[in-house]
Amino acid sequence: MNPLAAIELDLAYLGPDPLGEDRWVELLSSWLAQLQAELPSPLKADAYSLGLQFCDDAAIAELNGQWRQQPKPTDVLSFAAQEDAPEPLEGLPIELGDIVISIPTAERQAPEHGHSLQQELLFLASHGLLHLLGWDHPDEASLAAMLSRQDALVQGAAAH
């Protein structure tokens, strides 16, 4: 197994977090370490900083309307910091951005996808993380590749 990447995690709760901060730090660190070989050089690092926020449908609908002109609830939004970010200073973590997850939407989707709320949150967080790292899904092929990578991350998390 790859060593863990150091991570500074800024958690914000506007809703309950079924996993807890320690588990999120462990998961995100593990995922970032697993993804190192696939990252472009500017994103390869030993340490990262990112935000993870859990909110309700009203809060995510407001963000979705403001940033994507779709004023309705969604499951996860990602706000990448690296698109226009300056070169990171040596010795400091690379700021990736923020992931925002709607707990009520995740609660509705979990049974539809045939798994627990915890598994749905892992899936959504991994999706958000991949977006922060530059992955996107403008077409079916790239969506399939991204979902496959998410599945691998989530399955790896289940083994721990």
Swiss-Prot record:
NCBIfam families reported in the protein's UniProt record: rRNA maturation RNase YbeY
Main location: cytoplasm
Name by which UniProt lists this protein: Endoribonuclease YbeY
Family annotation (PROSITE patterns): UPF0054
Cofactor binding mode and count: Binds 1 zinc ion.
Top-level division of the source organism's lineage: Bacteria
Cofactor: Zn(2+)
GO terms (BP aspect): rRNA processing
GO terms of molecular function: metalloendopeptidase activity; RNA endonuclease activity; zinc ion binding
EC number(s) recorded for this UniProt protein: 3.1.-.-
One Pfam assignment: YbeY
Residue numbers binding Zn(2+): H127, H131, H137
Subcellular location: Cytoplasm
Record keywords, A-Z: Cytoplasm, Endonuclease, Hydrolase, Metal-binding, Nuclease, Ribosome biogenesis, rRNA processing, Zinc
GO cellular component terms attached to this protein's record: cytoplasm
Function description: Single strand-specific metallo-endoribonuclease involved in late-stage 70S ribosome quality control and in maturation of the 3' terminus of the 16S rRNA.
Family: Belongs to the endoribonuclease YbeY family.
